[in-house]
Amino acid sequence: MVVRKEKKSRKYRGYRTHGWGTKGQHRDRGAQGGRQIGMHKEKWSWTVKFGEGWYGKHGFRNPTSKLVNAIGLRKLQEYIDNDKIKIEEENGKKVVDLAKYGYDKLLGGGNLRLPLVIKVAKATEKAKERVKEIGGEIILTSSE
């Protein structure tokens, strides 16, 4: 028996692009939202308003520089007071291990009120002096 069914696609027969304009226009992703246009001409108003520092040279990041996470004595005392840094007891001494809290270096700004044994990778001379003055000690954990 003959199947009576309309053709699936019978519109625009003989019309090369089926109503989608120039060849290939229906095939791609549409307009690209201004990614390909020049900021100096077509999008100048945006560049003036939001694009500060868009043009010109802007330095570089030194690849050999090492970030040091440091803490001063003033901030250390503040964190101890607020229980952000806990004091541990070892052999009857109060010990703070700064490496456990992510600090690499102890700076000498400010003062401590407690004689502490502080374990840290690096410390400034001023920090060493101030900790010794109140009866504390700094144990350097790195070999540098």
Curated annotation (Swiss-Prot):
InterPro entries: Rbsml_uL15_N, Ribosomal_uL15, Ribosomal_uL15/eL18, Ribosomal_uL15/eL18_sf, Ribosomal_uL15_CS
Keyword rRNA-binding annotated: yes
Keyword Ribonucleoprotein attached: yes
Region forming the signal peptide: none
Biased composition (Basic residues): 1-16
An example Gene Ontology molecular-function term: rRNA binding
Gene3D superfamilies found in the cross-reference section: 3.100.10.10, 4.10.990.10
Region described as Disordered: 1-35
Annotated keywords: Ribonucleoprotein, Ribosomal protein, RNA-binding, rRNA-binding
Matches recorded under SUPFAM superfamilies: Ribosomal proteins L15p and L18e
Record note on quaternary structure: Part of the 50S ribosomal subunit.
HAMAP family in the cross-refs: Ribosomal_uL15
Record-stated family: Belongs to the universal ribosomal protein uL15 family.
The protein's role, per its UniProt record: Binds to the 23S rRNA.
The name this protein goes by in its record: Large ribosomal subunit protein uL15
Species annotation: Sulfolobus acidocaldarius (strain ATCC 33909 / DSM 639 / JCM 8929 / NBRC 15157 / NCIMB 11770)
